[in-house]
A protein has these predicted regions:
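Non-catalytic accessory/interaction domains
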Residues: 1-12, 16-170
Length: 170
């Protein structure tokens, strides 16, 4: 997930800083996170929830397409079940790679960072209703709650270039 958030070059910068600071030392996850954050000037405070909270987040997907406005709206909501000693969970910082596949072959690819309980993204100039390819490259270890039609699953299975989502759609 670090490489997904930082990009390949940013991840490399973080690794270089990590080894510069800690080579040969006994370190913690916090040391690794600090090196990634410092090397990329990125606040990863919320990312620590992955280390401090038990359980796997569940992400619910809701989508809406407005043909008249040529606008696609994607709403993601995250929850995590209570666990012993943690009856309530804070939102995780979840990086999700997505791609919108359309009949016109307009492919919008984006990295979404889900940091709140619910967030909505709007995509303009989408010529026809897209098929959503989400959590590409298994960008986050989540449980996905997403009802897709058989037609959409067939489109992903036959046309998606992401091996993880092709497998999941089958």
């Amino acid at each position: 997930m670090y490489q997904t958030l930082m990009g390949r070059d940013g991840f490399r910068k973080g690794m270089d800083l990590y080894f510069q600071r800690h080579d040969g030392q006994a370190v913690t996850c916090d040391d690794f996170l600090a090196a990634m954050a410092d090397a990329n000037n990125k606040d990863l405070t919320q990312f620590k929830n992955w280390y401090s909270q038990a359980g796997t987040p569940r992400v619910k997907v809701q989508e809406r397409y407005d043909a008249a406005k040529k606008q696609y709206e994607l709403t993601l909501s995250q929850t995590c079940a209570p666990s012993p000693g943690q009856p309530e969970k804070k939102p995780f910082h979840i990086p999700l790679k997505i791609r919108l596949l359309t009949k016109a072959n307009d492919q919008v690819e984006k990295l979404l960072e889900l940091t709140k309980e619910t967030q909505t993204w709007t995509f303009d100039n989408i010529e026809d209703r897209p098929v959503l390819s989400i959590n590409r490259d298994f960008s986050a270890p989540i449980n996905l709650d997403f009802e897709q039609s058989e037609e959409d699953l067939l489109t992903l299975f036959s046309s998606d270039d992401d091996p993880f989502n092709r497998w999941e759609s089958g």
